[in-house]
Amino acid sequence: GLKNTVWEMDDMPSCYTVDRLVKLRMDGVKFMIRLNPMDERSKYTVRYCAEAVNAAESAGLPIFIEALYVETTETGFTMKTDSESLCKVVGVVGALGCRASGKWIEVPLNHEYAVPTAATTCPVLVVPDEVKSEPIEVVEEYTKEIGISSNIRGILLGRNVMYNESDPLPIAEAIADIWHKGGNAEENYKRCVEKL
């Protein structure tokens, strides 16, 4: 939604359609949904998203949905990442459309991550906290979710990896190595730096 507009929670699609993505031979569909149960306009966003899920399924495209729960405050809308809020939005996203096949849910990281990831049988991609910037701390932040839930299938690399003051390549490689092979954050990062 357009920030600070009266229709911000009525987050209508304004860019690519699934038909256009198919014509461009794209590999999938990606969007974000902000659910605000106390704002009636949110119901329109839920409908738009359900229609997009159905269109993607009909086209045979996987769909990746970032699930965000927001509440209305005096200063606008604030994202909530407590487990109860995340379970609600993950449950809604999991139920969007006619089928769950091909649907991946991107879930913001919190301190009880096993709880919201258990709210769906869909594959989950971790959306980590991007506060840390020191390379080893970033690797630790991006790998602490491993093994929490069997439906966690990967992680989204954010700004603190892509635009880190240090070289982002060994950070990303260390994260991938730990996700696929296990190991220690510091040792993996140092090994990846030495490979350069």
Q: What residue spans do the PLM features occupy?
A:
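Short acidic/histidine-rich active-site segments
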Residues: 154-162
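Short, loop-centered acidic/histidine patches that primarily coordinate divalent metals
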Residues: 127-130, 159-160
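C-terminal helical cap(s) of enzyme catalytic domains, especially alpha/beta-barrels
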Residues: 148, 162-196
